[in-house]
Each structure stands twice: as structure tokens, then as C-alpha cells.
């Protein structure tokens, strides 16, 4: 396996690591503007639905709004170790049809994550040629497949339309 498969690809992987991947900074800048605007819009609408301004990013505060003020939970909802009703994505998905605020909160979280982890985080990490460098590791995973770290390019989202838009910046 090493002689026939892994050895011939070592030089290719080294070249990939050294060269990096070209990133279209303008696409990320445009996405940043668009997603920040949508985040601000969602925040306003969520506050309107809740009837008050609150920290959407605080699970504790969000739990109070959703389950105490809006009475959206039931006894089957999972609780956190502190006894608060969980606001994890999997728990909120179960409530999506109960109130429009749930879908808005899930979208708000997705946008916030994409902005902080990818869209706004990648540009400062680009080299002078607008390339992002990663370290690809042959047989880096337990299954034998290649792994990537120090900018894990295998983690760029692809399950949602919002996430897939980020991939268009990679050339």
C-alpha cells in the first residue's frame, strides 16, 4: 500500500501544503456584508417576536425567553446540568413548527457561526497572494483517508445553501 499508493502522492501533498489554496477575498467580503445585514435583520425580528430585546447568543437567556415567556417547551425537553431547558440545535429543531421564532434563531446561529468561523476569520489568514495554507496529512484519519489541519479545509460547510456559498470563494 505504501509503495503503490502513498509514496507516489507524498510529493503532491507536499506541494499542496506549500502552495495553499487561492481564495477570492471579494467573495468573502461580499458574503460578510450580506450575512451581517441579514444577522441584524434577524435580530430585530427575533426581538419583535419575543416582545423584548435580549442576548440571543446566551443559552440561559434564550431558554428563559422561549420556555418561560413564550411557553414553547414541554416536559420532554432536555435540560442542561444547571436545570435550564436546553436550547441546543437538536432540541430547537423539535420545536420548529411551534413558533416562527425558532427557525429565525436557528438561522441566526448558522449565520453567526459562518461569519465568525469562516467568512470573517479567513481573510486575515491569507498570505500576500491571497492563499490559505493548510497541512494535509496522508492517512491522517483512523480510516486511512487524508486529513487536514491548521486551517482544516475539509471542514468548509456544504450542507446548507448559506454554507455552500463560502466554498465559492475557493479557487
Model feature map: region roles:
Residues 1-162, 171:
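Conserved "right-hand" nucleotidyltransferase catalytic core of DNA-directed polymerases
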Amino acid at each position: 500500500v505504501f509503495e503503490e499508493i502513498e509514496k507516489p502522492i507524498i510529493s503532491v501533498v507536499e506541494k499542496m501544503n506549500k502552495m495553499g489554496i487561492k481564495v477570492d477575498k471579494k467573495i468573502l467580503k461580499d458574503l460578510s456584508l450580506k450575512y451581517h445585514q441579514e444577522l441584524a435583520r434577524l435580530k430585530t425580528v427575533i426581538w419583535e417576536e419575543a416582545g423584548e430585546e435580549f442576548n440571543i447568543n446566551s443559552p440561559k437567556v434564550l431558554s428563559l425567553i422561549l420556555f418561560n415567556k413564550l411557553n414553547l417547551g414541554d416536559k420532554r425537553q432536555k435540560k442542561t446540568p444547571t436545570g435550564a431547558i436546553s436550547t441546543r440545535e437538536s432540541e430547537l429543531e423539535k420545536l420548529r413548527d411551534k413558533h416562527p421564532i425558532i427557525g429565525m434563531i436557528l438561522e441566526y446561529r448558522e449565520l453567526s457561526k459562518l461569519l465568525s468561523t469562516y467568512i470573517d476569520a479567513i481573510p486575515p489568514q491569507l498570505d500576500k497572494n491571497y492563499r490559505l495554507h493548510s497541512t494535509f496529512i496522508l492517512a491522517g484519519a483512523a480510516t486511512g483517508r487524508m486529513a487536514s489541519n491548521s486551517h482544516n479545509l475539509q471542514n468548509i460547510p456544504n450542507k446548507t445553501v448559506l454554507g455552500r456559498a463560502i466554498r465559492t470563494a475557493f479557487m
